[in-house]
Amino acid sequence: MIDKRDDKPFKLKSKYKPSGDQPQAIESLVDNIEGGEKAQILLGATGTGKTYTMSQVISKVNKPTLVIAHNKTLAGQLYGEFKEFFPDNAVEYFVSYYDYYQPEAYVPSSDTYIEKDSSVNDEIDKLRHSATSSLLERNDVIVVASVSCIYGLGSPKEYADSAVSLRPGQEISRDTLLNQLVDIQFERNDIDFQRGCFRVRGDVVEVFPASRDEHAFRVEFFGDEIDRICEIESLTGKTIGEVDHLVLFPATHFVTNDEHMEQSIAKIQAELAEQLQLFESEGKLLEAQRLRQRTEYDIEMLREMGYTSGVENYSRHMDGRSPGEPPYTLLDFFPEDFLIMIDESHMTMGQIKGMYNGDQARKQMLVDYGFRLPSALDNRPLRRKEFESHVHQIVYVSATPGEYEMSQTNTIIEQIIRPTGLLDPEIDVRPSMGQMDDLLGEINQRVARDERTFITTLTKKMAEDLTDYLKEMGVKVKYMHSDIKTLERTEIIRDLRLGVFDVLIGINLLREGIDVPEVSLVAILDADKEGFLRNERGLIQTIGRAARNVDGHVIMYADKMTDSMQRAIDETARRREIQIAYNKAHGIVPQTIKKDIRGFISISKTSHNDISKEEMDYESMSRGERKEAINALQKQMQEAAELLDFELAAQMRDLILELKLMD
């Protein structure tokens, strides 16, 4: 039995106190949640401390909370911040555990079957298990997740019911415990003791839970009774302390008992017979043979091992769901009365909507050509409507809320004041005629003041032409486009901040990590060309890039005033007015944000006599040197992950993948 602790409150620890309009935003959000409001929007301008406000709300409403971000990097940053704010509570991280993932697919035009290929990140897998076990054991839980949280995960009831509960004095034989551990997918390994394994030494069983990476547990028997349970260091075996209750959750999220497994296999066999009959009636003998061979192999593995590669494709039968019924996801592990916060909701909600369609198109091809049973289509992400059905209370957080969020609620809480007193930038609209000369003059003014400039264009060609022109004029300039890899992008931003060059040109400079306090000018070319990057939301996001500097200024080059431009200008002016009034009333002098410049990733290069640290020329390396570089990077990636620097770890991961592709 799981003893769930539901009385521990969230305890926020911070050297800051709410300032600006944070107190009003926190109070309004909390009052609305306690008053039963289902949905509300926190409209927070860039740099106003939205994460701190979210933390204050969580600590006051005291509900288990799911925070969803639109990518792993952002989720990692939020996870680190929440860990600092809530050191005594369970802050968990739940994202896709694949470092590399090539989904199973079939291309009929070339008769090419692509086997599923993936590389699982052991650290993230541990964190996922930690998240689900925390949700079943306690109430003071914050899970920071990417949209992976809407993908199928296995039944929380089966997961909880399969848990092995142990206490000192409990009557259970050693062999019974070993059988129970095997049933929940733990492996016996007396030599290489790692997560998801157990080892046996006489009357002592040591178990390494899937949710830990340093500490394991030692269960000591006296006859058919547990004498003592100790927490131990997994590496040295040193005892940390005794525990009076140990719950061991399954080593995989897809788990089922023997009786249920036989029922599931019977359903899989019935579906197989039905699909084979259909293929044979249509004369698709190759597809029928393929499906029979693959499915019968999987059934044999399930029967003998309780697991098979691609077991998730049979999740509908394992969970006992009807065709078309939504899969179990992380959301089902939460209690009914939980809170959802959607960070950067204008991006994240679009992702939640789009996940289902892309997944179904690929899987339908596998079903049509006999690679999978039709039930594989039910191993899928949630549809948006299904996601909505899980929502008890939700807060959308964004500087520019999308149409979807606005359609869900009329309750909008604004957070416009920055703790630094910084104002939204002033905006000029200038004609496109003569824009190059005008822009060059503005750039030179910034260079003279040791400030930087962002220029955003609409096309790759224009960005390239503008880069060439400014170089001819003696400006130190770089162009950042979509082909540039993650690590190189980080290096470019660092060089911009250090003053290696003064101007950065790009098409979409809204990506995370592009907040540069040294940028005092943002120039928007073709501002009057309506579209994704020139709509109201896109313009406000771009304008926000200049909001980190006290001299922040935006120039829109356009021949006409579009509705989007006018709305973006009006909204920025409205916010600026509020900020000026607040600063005046409280005697605040705006200050440019101070932000440390992180060093570029470098690895050790070994020569015959010495080791020097320098940036590597990977292209000219031999295969052996690249292998050494990969090993060094993997070590640094693990160190970064242990320090909770997931942004750095993700950059390392991307570089490792690039190096592997060179071979």
From Swiss-Prot:
Region entry Disordered, spans: 1-23
Q: Name one Pfam family in it.
A: Helicase_C
Give the UniProt subcellular location, in the record's own words. Answer: Cytoplasm
Which InterPro entries would you find in this protein's record?
Helicase/UvrB_N, Helicase_ATP-bd, Helicase_C-like, P-loop_NTPase, UVR_dom, UVR_dom_sf, UvrB, UvrB_inter
Molecular-function GO term, any one: DNA binding
In this protein, which residues make up the domain named Helicase C-terminal?
435-597
**SMART domains, from UniProt?**
DEXDc (SM00487), HELICc (SM00490)
Disulfide-bond pairs as recorded: none
List each copy of the Helicase ATP-binding domain by range.
Answer: 31-418
GO terms for biological process, alphabetical: nucleotide-excision repair; SOS response
The UniProt record lists the keyword Nucleotide-binding = yes
Q: Where is this motif: Beta-hairpin?
A: 97-120
Please describe what this protein does.
The UvrABC repair system catalyzes the recognition and processing of DNA lesions. A damage recognition complex composed of 2 UvrA and 2 UvrB subunits scans DNA for abnormalities. Upon binding of the UvrA(2)B(2) complex to a putative damaged site, the DNA wraps around one UvrB monomer. DNA wrap is dependent on ATP binding by UvrB and probably causes local melting of the DNA helix, facilitating insertion of UvrB beta-hairpin between the DNA strands. Then UvrB probes one DNA strand for the presence of a lesion.
Quote the subunit structure annotation.
Forms a heterotetramer with UvrA during the search for lesions. Interacts with UvrC in an incision complex.
- Alphabetized HAMAP family for the sequence: UvrB
Question: Into which family does the record put it?
Answer: Belongs to the UvrB family.
Task: Let me see what the UniProt entry remarks about domains.
Answer: The beta-hairpin motif is involved in DNA binding.
What protein is this chain from?
Answer: UvrABC system protein B
Annotated organism of origin: Streptococcus pyogenes serotype M18 (strain MGAS8232)
